[in-house]
């Protein structure tokens, strides 16, 4: 028996039926957001429909924008039922269904409730399967400059190191922190450090924030690291020795990350560190109340365990000397350890210190005396760290002087809030004019500022208000307006106007063959995660330079196919972010004990279960259209 599926009669029947569908569809293709991406256009081209003879039927269904993620225009709906099946059968949420009767039939929620009240989890499977623009992203990805993956899973795309955030969050939600930390360690050797001090750009992009509050991704990373069972080591691999040697200058996050991956690739790696303890700015720039030293020491020990040698108290002054040690490549991860001067009269007075020096002295256990009243000049994270450190050193009154408003303050909002809770005062729109030393006290003359048009940084430029000068008295003044690298002239490297090392951004190679540079020495003061990303890139480039493949990727936990079934959870849209438990302010300022205490298992699981699991949308296989049906 032969079954014919493309006879002239069947072709005409398809056109007739398709005309019935299009009769109720608005004729606004040219202005539709899905123009040239609409399946109706593709089918019309495939079946050869050239005109519509039936009179149009104008439906007057409402257009709903009751959520921040997508738009619902049921005038464009063809009642194919894909979205309903995706919600009910693929996800198990049952937030939408067919409602109404006859010509009033449409897709909606029970009792016309909002999506949030109907149990929707905003996974956007419905949007992915919709053939028209009836359900469409508020801003379709093709109207952005992003790839679909970056648009759909912005948290993963925002991570400089490329950590698979949805995957490890899912493992935490399932009560498997060992697998979660394995996923994190596939990209970084410092999960515990990042779980405490990462600037979390992923959270800034988290789509859940558009609903209520972002997932506490950093806290979940810390939970996974704190519950590391070490099983990831079973899948960790070491390459055979290559006979090549790499010298790394600086044991900060960039240097140690590069060292870790290069050692695993079989190279002999020696890290040269000028300080008496390893860790760079992780040790001497971040106070212990934010990053306990035992956490840092434990993760550095893992790096040493793969064969990395760290030589302390060795300040490298010459590249020529390094070459003579027998290395085949050099990576400069010098950090940014020099504080920037205030540029005002009197800053050389006794009692004035830059925050980089202060934090280094405190971190290395050296004696520091600040007195009872301390001023901190600046508005970044270093200024906040210096102010909170001053409290812990016994200061009774700590005042931050910042020339812009709080809205322009570059410091982390949560760190600023914690400083205020601890009793730090902040004078906004205030700038220092000069410092004088009188009667064993520092007189800090300040002037009030107002904000004008934005400057090159994008922030509104502060300008002084004439006649608004006033004077404050302090025992110490801490300058915290920035820091920069110290690049020895003997290195003979090309540098920028900001005194950072000039490199090829694609490879991090310098003007000298075989010499690479990264981290704060190249970017200027940045974050731990950005430095780690630079260390990864350097390891890749150096391995290729030494004849390797440059493949530093690892699979520490076997890949699995995520379960598309989400199930129904009443009130999901309203689940609030779990607050990080912490020491009371009065208790914390008496020591350098860690302030944040970490989530327990129940808190971590609940917080992880708040995830929208945006990545599941990418698991839906794109529709394969018939040959010759592309509307474009």
Where are these regions (language model features)?
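FAD-site-proximal beta/loop scaffold in flavoenzymes
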Residues: 348-372, 454-525, 529-533, 540, ...
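Glycine-rich Rossmann-fold phosphate-binding loop(s) that bind the pyrophosphate
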Residues: 249-254, 379-380, 520
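Glycine-rich dinucleotide-binding loop and its adjacent helix/turn
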Residues: 223-240, 298-315, 339-393, 496-511
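Fe-S ferredoxin-like electron-transfer domains
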Residues: 1-270, 274-275, 282-289, 300, ...
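Feature captures the FAD/FMN-dependent oxidoreductase FAD-binding
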Residues: 179, 240, 245-249, 297-344, ...
């Amino acid at each position: 028996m032969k079954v014919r599926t493309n006879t002239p009669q069947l072709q005409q029947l398809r056109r007739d039926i398709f005309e019935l569908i299009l009769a109720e569809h608005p004729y606004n293709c040219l202005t539709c957001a899905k123009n040239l991406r609409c399946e109706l256009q593709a089918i019309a081209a495939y079946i050869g429909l050239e005109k519509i003879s039936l009179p149009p039927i104008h439906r007057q269904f409402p257009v709903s924008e009751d959520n921040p993620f997508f738009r619902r225009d049921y005038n464009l709906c063809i009642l194919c039922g894909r979205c309903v099946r995706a919600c009910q059968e693929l996800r198990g949420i049952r937030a939408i269904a067919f409602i109404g009767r006859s010509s009033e039939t449409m897709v909606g929620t029970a009792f016309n409730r909002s999506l949030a009240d109907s149990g929707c989890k905003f996974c956007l499977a419905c949007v992915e399967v919709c053939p028209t623009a009836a359900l469409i992203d508020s801003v379709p990805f093709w109207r952005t400059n992003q790839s679909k993956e970056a648009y759909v899973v912005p948290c993963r795309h925002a991570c400089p190191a490329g950590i698979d955030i949805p995957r490890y969050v899912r493992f935490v939600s399932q009560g498997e922190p060992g697998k979660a930390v394995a996923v994190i360690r596939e990209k970084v050797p410092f999960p515990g450090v990042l779980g405490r001090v990462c600037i979390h750009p992923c959270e800034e992009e988290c789509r859940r924030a558009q609903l209520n509050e972002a997932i506490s991704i950093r806290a979940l990373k810390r939970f996974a690291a704190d519950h590391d069972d070490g099983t990831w080591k079973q899948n960790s691999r070491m390459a055979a020795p290559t006979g090549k040697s790499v010298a790394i200058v600086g044991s900060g996050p960039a240097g140690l990350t590069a060292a870790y991956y290069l050692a695993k690739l079989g190279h002999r790696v020696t890290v040269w560190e000028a300080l008496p303890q390893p860790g760079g700015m992780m040790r001497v720039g971040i106070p212990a109340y934010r990053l306990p030293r035992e956490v840092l020491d434990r993760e550095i020990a893992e790096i040493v365990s793969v064969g990395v040698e760290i030589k302390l108290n060795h300040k490298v002054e010459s590249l020529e000397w390094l070459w003579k040690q027998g290395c085949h490549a050099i990576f400069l991860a010098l950090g940014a350890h020099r504080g920037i001067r205030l540029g005002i009269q009197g800053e050389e007075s006794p009692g004035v210190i830059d925050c980089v020096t202060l934090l280094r002295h405190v971190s290395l256990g050296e004696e520091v005396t600040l007195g009872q009243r301390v001023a901190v000049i600046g508005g970044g994270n270093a200024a906040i760290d210096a102010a909170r450190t001053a409290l812990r050193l016994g200061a009774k009154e700590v005042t931050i002087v910042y020339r812009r408003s709080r809205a322009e303050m570059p410091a982390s909002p949560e760190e600023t809030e914690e400083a205020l809770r601890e009793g730090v005062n902040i004078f906004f729109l205030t700038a220092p004019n000069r410092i004088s030393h009188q009667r064993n006290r520092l007189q800090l003359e300040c002037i009030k500022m107002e904000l004008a048009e934005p400057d090159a940084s994008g922030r509104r430029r502060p300008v002084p208000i004439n006649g608004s000068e006033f004077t404050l008295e302090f025992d110490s003044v801490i300058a915290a307006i920035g820091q920069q690298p110290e690049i020895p002239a003997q290195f003979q490297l090309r540098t920028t106007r900001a005194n950072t090392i000039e490199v090829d951004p694609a490879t991090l190679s310098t003007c000298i063959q075989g010499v690479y540079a990264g981290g704060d020495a190249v970017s200027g003061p940045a974050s731990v995660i950005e430095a780690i990303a630079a260390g990864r890139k350097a390891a890749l480039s150096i391995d290729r330079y030494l004849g390797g493949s440059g493949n530093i990727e690892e699979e520490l936990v076997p890949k699995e196919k995520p379960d598309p079934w989400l199930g129904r959870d009443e009130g999901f849209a309203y689940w609030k972010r779990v607050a990080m438990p912490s020491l009371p302010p009065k208790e914390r300022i008496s020591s350098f004990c860690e302030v944040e205490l970490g989530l327990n298992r129940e808190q971590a699981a609940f917080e992880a279960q708040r995830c929208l699991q945006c990545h599941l949308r990418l698991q839906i296989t794109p529709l394969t259209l018939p040959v010759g049906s592309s509307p474009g």
